[in-house]
C-alpha cells in the first residue's frame, strides 16, 4: 500500500528532478487517479492497455528476451513473494529502494547518490536504457512479466548491475508492468514483488531521463507503474489491509499530489479524513491488516467493521501516511510495516497528545481513540448502562481489539468491567489469541490507552462511575506500564479505594467492578507482565491471564495482600532460622571433634606428614638390605654404566668367533669374499662346460654354440642337400652320396636317407630354425 504511494511520491520527486514534474503532476498523480478510477474497475486493464501502447511503440524484444532469461529467477522470486505478498513486497521495496532514486525520496540519504548514479548511468547509456525499456515494452506479457518479476525480486540483483541498469530495467519494467497488466497472474506476482512500484517510479524519474524522447512511454510507464503498483502488492496487500482497491491507497497518495515522499511525513489531519472518506468500510480491515499483515485478521475485522470502520480507516490511513511519512524510504513496507512501526512511534509520541488530542490523533493513533473511548464508554456502559456508547465502545473495542491483534489484549482489559465483560470477553478471547503475533502494537496501544484512560478517568471523576473507571483507567495505565508492572499495583489499590468512596451507588456493582479491577489490575501485572516479559507471545499469555483472571480476580487481590505480607514474614522466619543456626554451630564444632579431624586440621599444613616422609627416606636401610647402597649412590647410572662396560669386555666372545676383525667388517667384507668363491665355483663349472664366456651369454649363447655344432652337421647335410639337388643330376657322385648317408646315419634318421636330398635340406633348415628359436 505504502509502496505505490511512496513510489508515486518518489515519482513526483524524480519527475521534478528529471524535469518530468509536469507529466508527473499531470500524468503521475492525475494518471494515478484516473488509473485508480480505472483500476477500481480493473487495475489490470489500464496496465494492459498501456503495455499494448508501450509494446506497439517499442519494436524490439531483444532486451525483453534477455530479461526473460532472468525471468525464471524473477518468477521464482515473485512466487516466493506471493507467499507473503505484503511482507515480501515490503521487504523487496526496501531492497529496491537503492535501485531507483525512489529510496531517496523514501528518505534514504544514500539514495541521492544512487539517483545521481542512476541518472548518470542513464545519461551515459540512455539509449541502452531505452533499448532495455523498449525490450520490456516490446516483450509480450509473460517475458516482460517475468522480467518484471525479475526487476521486482532482482530489483536487488539488478542493483549490483548498477543503478543505471537497475533504473533501466525498472524503466523497462514499467512497460513490462503494463504488459504484466495484460497478464493478470504475473501482475499479481509483480504486485507481490512491489518492486515494480519502486521500479516504476525510477522509470518515471531515471527512466524519464533515460528516454526523454519517450515521454508517452514514461507517462505510460508511470501510469502503468502507478496502476501496476496498485495492481501490485498494494492491490493484494492493501486490499487485505484496507479492504479497498490499491487505487485507494494510490489515490490517497495522489490526494497529496504535492506531497513528496520526504514531505510525506507531514500529513494533515484533513488528509486522514480524506483518506478515511476515500477508504470505505473496507479500510477497517486495512488497519488490522497493516498491523497484522500475515495474521489474516480480516475475519476478525469483519466483526468490528460495523462500528469502527471510519475510525479505523482514518487511523489506518493516518498510520499508513504516517508510516509513509516516517518511513518514506521503506515503500515496500508501506503503511503495513510503516503503519505498525510508525503507528507505534506516533502512538507513543502522541500518547500525551492522544490523551488531549484524541479526536485529531485518533485517526493516527487508532488505539488511542478506541481504547480510551472503549474504557470510558465501557465503564459508562457497565455502570451508567449507556447502551449506545457501550455498544459503540464494544464494537469499536472489538474492532480495535480484532484489528489490533495486540490491542485486543488491551480491549479485553477494558471490557472486563462489569456488564461489558461478557460482550467484550468474547472479543478479547477471539482477538487476544492473535495479539501474540503483534506485540508491538500492544505496547504502542497501551500507552495511548493509558493516556486516554487518564482522560476518561478525569471525565468520569465527577461520577461514582469514575471510581470504577478509575480502576479501569488504572488498569490501562497498567497496560502502559506493562513494562512497569509496579505502576499497575499502585493504580490497582486506588481502584478499590475509589469504589469505597462511591460505596453507596456501587455497593452492588463493586463486586463485578472489583473483579474486573482485580482482573485488570492484576492481569496487567501477571498477564501483562508475563505477556510483556515474553514479547514473542505477549498476547497469548495476556489472554490466558485475562481469561482466568475473570473468574479468579478477587482471589488474586487478596493473594497480593497476602503475598505482600508474607515477604516480611519470610524475612522474620529467615531471621529466626538464622538465630537457630548459631545453635547448631557449636554442634558442628563438636561434630568436628567427633570426626577427630581437629588435630588433623592443625596438622593439615603437612608438617608432621612431611616429617614422616623424611623418615621414610631414612628407611634407606631397606636399600642397604638390597645390598645396593653403593649402587643407590651410583643410581644415576654409574654402577649400571660399569656393568655396561663389562658386557663390552664380553667382546671376547667375538674373539671366540675368530671374527673380531671381521666383526668390524661385518658390513659384508667376508661375505663378499665368499661370493667371490662362489663365482669361482661357477667359473669352474663353466670351465667344465667349456663355455665360461658363454655363461655370460647363458641366455642362449651356449645353446647357440651347440646349435652351431648342429649347424655344422646340418651344413654338411646342407652340402648333402645341395648335393642331393645335384645328386638328382649328379647321382654318380659317390662321395656325396656316402657323406650324406653317413651324416644321416649319425642323425640316426633312416628316413633322411629315404627322403630326397632337397627334403633333407628343408628339414635341416627347419631344425636349425627351431633350435635357434629355442636357443633364443
Swiss-Prot record:
Biased composition (Low complexity): 324-340, 529-549
Disulfide bonding pattern of the chain: none
A Pfam entry, by short name: Tubulin-binding
PTM section of the record: Polyubiquitinated. Requires functional TRAF6 and may provoke SQSTM1-dependent degradation by the proteasome.
Localization terms from the record: Cytoplasm, Cytosol; Cell membrane; Cytoplasm, Cytoskeleton; Cell projection, Axon
PROSITE patterns xref list: TAU_MAP_1, TAU_MAP_2
Swiss-Prot/TrEMBL Tau/MAP repeat ranges: 579-609, 610-640, 641-671, 672-703
One Gene Ontology MF term: microtubule binding
Positions of modified residues (Phosphoserine): 46, 61, 214, 502, 526, 530, 533-534, 537, 549, 570, 572, 597, 620, 624, 628, 640, 659, 687, 691, 731, 735, 739, 744, 751, 757
Modified-residue entries (N6,N6-dimethyllysine), positions: 480, 646
Residues recorded with modification Phosphotyrosine: 18, 29, 532, 729
Main location: cytoplasm
Keywords associated with the record: Acetylation, Cell membrane, Cell projection, Cytoplasm, Cytoskeleton, Isopeptide bond, Membrane, Methylation, Microtubule, Phosphoprotein, Repeat, Ubl conjugation
Ranges annotated as biased composition (Basic and acidic residues): 1-26, 179-189, 207-216, 314-323, 344-356, 381-393, 455-466, 517-528
Cross-link for Glycyl lysine isopeptide (Lys-Gly) (interchain with G-Cter in ubiquitin), residue positions: 44, 589, 594, 602, 616, 633, 646, 652, 656, 666, 678, 682, 688, 704, 710, 720
Entry domain remark: The tau/MAP repeat binds to tubulin.
Protein name stated in the entry: Microtubule-associated protein tau
Species assigned in the record: Gorilla gorilla gorilla
Name of the gene this protein is made from: MAPT
